[in-house]
């Protein structure tokens, strides 16, 4: 029996599932009667999605379809950080959607402090863009996961738990 147990807390998403959701979104834009003539474009870059379309109304429709497709692909909607829309050349509307990936140092410190304040029997260490939580009891680690779940809702960030040993 192991003397200590641990798990990692990360903020990540499956990039291939996002690619699949964007492909489905593009297909629906080309087939839906209200979006077909809007001359809309959706580009997936490394850390953002750029949506370009003809009006605010079609932009809102495309946002809704994007969220719907992401939900069906089991992606957390918290990964999307919608920026305000802006007008671009040719009377078109453009919106940049940043993708949240990884824990920032500030966010990692907040999460670490929240767990250390409530649970004295576990240690939390920051490792780059993830957290490592170790403890002698699996029950303590389960309590830490509950605290992380509450903080996930408060701070509006997607969290996953990996390498539970």
Swiss-Prot record:
Signal peptide positions (record): none
One Pfam family matching this protein: DUF520
Record has Kinase as a keyword: no
A GO term for molecular function: nucleotide binding
Keyword terms, alphabetized: Nucleotide-binding
SUPFAM superfamilies listed in its UniProt record: YajQ-like (SSF89963)
CDD domains xrefs: YajQ_like
GO cellular component entries: cytosol
Domain of life: Bacteria
InterPro entries for the chain: DUF520 (IPR007551), UPF0234-like_C (IPR035571), UPF0234_N (IPR035570), YajQ-like_sf (IPR036183)
NCBIfam families assigned: PRK05412.1
Task of the protein: Nucleotide-binding protein.
The family this protein is said to belong to: Belongs to the YajQ family.
Protein name: Nucleotide-binding protein P9211_04811
Source organism of the structure: Prochlorococcus marinus (strain MIT 9211)
């Amino acid at each position: 029996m192991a003397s200590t147990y641990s798990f990692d807390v990360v903020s990540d998403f499956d990039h291939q599932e996002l690619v699949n959701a964007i492909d489905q979104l593009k297909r629906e834009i080309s087939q839906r009667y209200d979006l077909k003539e809007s001359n809309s474009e959706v580009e997936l870059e490394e850390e953002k999605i750029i949506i370009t379309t003809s009006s605010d109304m079609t932009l809102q429709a495309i946002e809704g379809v994007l969220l719907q497709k992401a939900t069906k692909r089991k992606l957390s909607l918290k990964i999307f950080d919608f920026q305000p829309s802006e007008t671009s050349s040719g009377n078109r509307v453009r919106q940049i959607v940043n993708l949240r990936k990884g824990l920032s140092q500030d966010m990692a410190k907040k999460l670490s402090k929240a767990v250390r304040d409530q649970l004295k029997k576990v240690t939390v260490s920051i490792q780059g863009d993830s957290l490592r939580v170790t403890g002698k009891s699996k029950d303590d680690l389960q309590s830490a996961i509950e605290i992380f779940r509450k903080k996930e809702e408060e701070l509006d960030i997607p969290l996953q738990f990996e390498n539970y040993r």
